Regions:
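Formylglycine-dependent sulfatase
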Residues: 1-205
Length: 205
């Protein structure tokens, strides 16, 4: 389109609900009316990261392997995006390309290999009040925010950590561990795309 090769990988939440059926109509789907030549991913706002509702174009398909064999949606779409980019480079080296990469992370469901969540074991046991204070101070130290910035008040809908039921705290801490692992996992795979662009010296394009 306009001289570009185009592809979308991952989540497509732009299709109206009444057009998401696998029977069509497909005029709002990425590769039929959404402006992309190639699409690999899922339609909607969320999907199971181990058993996603996958489509290639408008064709439903099963994941290439099972979770027991190491399947995860983020890794899959990254593999597909890297392969597509390399194919474009090999076949049409002079033609620019556009990749829209939209992983399911960190939208629910928060599903990520255990080794990524275990890296954060115990990191959130102090609770969200202490964590937000530490994060805020670190952002100031790194000049991410101005030195004069003030920490906003905790939303009234969220209880103080000290007031949370002690039996619930381990569950909430584990949820934060999983979220952090999920976020680092997707960051790692985005890094794989960046590595390819750095290899080709096109990251600044």
């Amino acid at each position: 389109l306009n001289g570009y090769s185009t592809a979308q990988f991952g989540k497509c939440h732009e299709v109206p609900v009444w057009k998401t059926s696998p029977m069509g109509p497909f005029d709002a789907w990425p590769s039929r009316g959404g402006g992309f030549e190639h699409f690999y991913g899922f339609i909607g706002g969320e999907t199971n990261q181990y058993y996603p509702s996958l489509y290639e174009g408008t064709k439903p398909l099963e994941p290439p392997k099972s979770p027991e064999e190491g399947y995860h949606f983020t890794e899959d779409i990254t593999d597909k995006a890297v392969n597509w980019m390399r194919q474009q480079k090999a076949l049409m080296a002079d033609r620019p390309f556009f990749v829209y990469f939209a992983p399911g992370a960190t939208h629910a469901p928060h599903q990520v290999p255990k080794e990524w969540t275990d890296k954060y074991k115990g990191k959130f046991d102090q609770g969200w009040d202490k964590i937000r204070e530490e994060t805020f101070a670190r952002q100031k130290k790194l000049n991410v925010i101005p030195e004069t910035a003030e920490l906003t008040a905790r939303p009234k809908e969220i209880p103080a950590w000290d007031e949370v039921d002690p039996n619930l705290k381990p569950v909430l801490a584990r949820q934060m561990e999983v979220y952090a692992g999920f976020m680092e996992h997707v960051d790692h795979h985005v890094g794989r795309l960046i590595d390819v662009m750095e290899e080709w010296e096109i990251l600044d394009d």
